Amino acid sequence: LAVGNDSLRFLLDDMSVTVDGKTYASDDVKTQIHNGNVNYYDAGSVNELSQSDMDAIIAYAQSKNISIIPLINTPGHMDAILSAATSLTGVNCSAYDSVRTIDVANTTAVAFTQALLQKYINYFAGKGCGYFNMGADEYANDKTDGFAALIKDKKYGNFVSYVNAVAAQIVAAGMTPIAFNDGIYYNSNTSGGEFSKDIVVSYWTTGWT
């Protein structure tokens, strides 16, 4: 269930986040996420699902013995979250001026994103979900040649560390993390370190070389 892929079409009741000692109010976060969604694609009168909407979707799925695997893609495909992070913190959180990818070497960008993800991880874990897909594909490929640029700029290790940190958040909540394959040991490159063995790799492409 791709609730966060470029846009973020599901808002929790409490969207407040604390980053670097500063708390951003729930309504302010919702407003900035909504603005980011509209900038990506204006869906009209209903741009986001509410928490009660999602509660109902999950309850119906469970009644039919259907398992929900939520997806919030990170650190790429994050147009709405990136827009909100930059607007709220006043820090440019973008990688390579991408409109969709946070800079994994920027501590504010990482802290904001992980704080927001934690709320969704907690929500879906509380609903009994066994897996959480963090995406982790197509890094800033709207502005660069993606993971090749990270390796060239010696930031691939930052990506590995970021993915492992998010995976650890998911595992700590009792779920299994999923990531798409193209950024995992990109082009057989191991210079960034070792990815967590807790991650289930989902193959959607033969990879970009």
Q: What is each model feature region?
A:
Residues 1-147:
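Feature activates predominantly on carbohydrate-active enzymes
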